[in-house]
């Protein structure tokens, strides 16, 4: 069974774990570690594929922001965020739909990661102030990123993971 997320986008795969990260092309090919252009990262140890943010304006632009919306709870109109590529419906549901339409890295059923899944790429021991391996995720912002997990006692809210100290 295949499942996808956002970077956070992420794609869940059934493969043998070999505890390595791989750069992945927009078409889904595994690239050399020294490749300078890639769109996703395969984490073999967790059998997950992650979306990589871009320095270029577009759907994957690292400075885009979104409200959380799962189709039922949250902000469907992006009231609190108008800072996305299309300038409307700046929410996680619209973002996921647009990534799926693009067939990013050869996949079309991306989803937001769970809280546990997103925490697997937080790097507290790296050399960057941004708590992630910037060799694989160079455009990740020192900010919080949404998960698919809503708060138990208030399903209109969702958990975020901070990619900075003090978050």
What label would you give each PLM region?
Residues 17-111, 115-167:
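Glycine-aromatic-enriched surface loops/turns that form tight recognition elements
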């Amino acid at each position: 069974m295949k499942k996808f997320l956002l970077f956070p986008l992420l794609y869940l795969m059934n493969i043998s774990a070999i505890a390595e990260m791989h750069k992945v092309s927009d078409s889904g090919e595994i690239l050399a570690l020294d490749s300078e252009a890639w769109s996703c990262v395969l984490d073999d140890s967790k059998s997950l594929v992650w979306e990589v943010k871009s320095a270029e304006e577009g759907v994957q632009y690292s400075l885009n922001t979104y409200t959380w919306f799962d189709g039922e709870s949250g902000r469907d109109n992006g009231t609190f965020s108008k800072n996305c590529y299309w300038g409307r419906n700046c929410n996680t549901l619209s973002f996921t739909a647009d990534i799926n339409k693009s067939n990013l890295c050869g996949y079309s059923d991306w989803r937001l990661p769970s809280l546990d899944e997103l925490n697997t790429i937080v790097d507290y021991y790296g050399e960057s102030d941004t708590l992630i391996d910037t060799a694989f995720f160079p455009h990740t912002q020192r900010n919080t990123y949404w998960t698919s997990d809503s708060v138990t006692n208030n399903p209109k809210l969702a958990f975020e993971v901070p990619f900075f100290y003090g978050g």
